[in-house]
Amino acid sequence: MKVGIVGSGMVGSATAYALALLGVAREVVLVDLDRKLAQAHAEDILHATPFAHPVWVRAGSYGDLEGARAVVLAAGVAQRPGETRLQLLDRNAQVFAQVVPRVLEAAPEAVLLVATNPVDVMTQVAYRLSALPPGRVVGSGTILDTARFRALLAEHLRVAPQSVHAYVLGEHGDSEVLVWSSAQVGGVPLLEFAEARGRALSPEDRARIDEGVRRAAYRIIEGKGATYYGIGAGLARLVRAILTDEKGVYTVSAFTPEVEGVLEVSLSLPRILGAGGVEGTVYPSLSPEEREALRRSAEILKEAAFALGF
């Protein structure tokens, strides 16, 4: 099965590398305005496949996306140190106005998987530009934030992160909502499990974990300029869910008719992901404080998209 990636920068190339190592696709096509960059990444990643899986990785044009089941949209400008994801909006919306029509001309049946930041607003932009059913335009959303939340909880509790079920909702960014109230470990409510484990979560512990999740991207960008390994692996996992019709639940961003009274906004909620993209949304139980925080997050994203006319 073929997967396309538009944008061969750090996120696009990391995604291609993760796809190859995990053996998610049989063919990966990298498309970029800088053909030499795309070719260099494709050749380098191809040389890793003898140590992993038989995946054909190559550079191509938009026409080479024909037949792709999923296309990752990673084109855009990089986030600068200290710059919020929403400040990227104007620059990256202009890029998508050129990219989305060309992708759909070549691969009209593909699920569009948006990775460009600010990802929630860019998901809304891609949805409006594409005129596709809303489920076929999926943003990477808070999958990485959710993974960070689970990893930090697991570290505190000294359990495997795979046993932790906790979500980050709303914006992939400053207004994101860590859902503590419905978090579980091995099917046991989080606070109850923590007490039984002898690893109670004090207010200071919760503040430290919240800070660790919320500020992770800023710390990484300050240290090395960009984040790409984590999101590359996350995107590869979403592609696998689409190609295998997995119907797993992921906190991805998609157009949502209404959330907490805010209409027509793209943001992250737990969603069922399969061959057609988003096939359903699971609205979790939230505390009153979490509901209010989610409403505020939705309003921030709604205002940003509205300012662009989307």
UniProtKB/Swiss-Prot annotation:
**Outcome of mutating A216R:** Increases the thermal stability of the enzyme. In the absence of fructose 1,6-bisphosphate (FBP), the Q4(R) mutant exhibits a 4-fold increased Vmax value and a 5-fold increase of the affinity for pyruvate
Catalysed reaction(s) here are:
(S)-lactate + NAD(+) = pyruvate + NADH + H(+)
Phosphotyrosine modifications at: Y218
* Activity control mechanisms: Allosterically activated by fructose 1,6-bisphosphate (FBP). It binds two fructose 1,6-bisphosphate (FBP) molecules per tetramer.
Pfam families noted in UniProt = Ldh_1_C, Ldh_1_N
Transmembrane residue ranges: none
Keywords associated with the record:
Allosteric enzyme, Cytoplasm, NAD, Oxidoreductase, Phosphoprotein
Residues that bind substrate: Q79, R85, N117, P118, V119, D120, D145, T146, A147, R148, T227
| Gene Ontology biological-process annotations | glycolytic process; lactate metabolic process
> Which positions does UniProt annotate for beta-D-fructose 1,6-bisphosphate binding?
R150, Q162, S163, V164, H165, A166, Y167
Q: Which GO terms describe its molecular function?
A: L-lactate dehydrogenase activity
Relate the outcome reported for changing L46E: Increases the thermal stability of the enzyme. In the absence of fructose 1,6-bisphosphate (FBP), the Q4(R) mutant exhibits a 4-fold increased Vmax value and a 5-fold increase of the affinity for pyruvate
What family does the Swiss-Prot or TrEMBL record give for this protein? Belongs to the LDH/MDH superfamily. LDH family.
Query: What is the official name of this protein in its record?
Result: L-lactate dehydrogenase
Q: Which organism is it from?
A: Thermus caldophilus
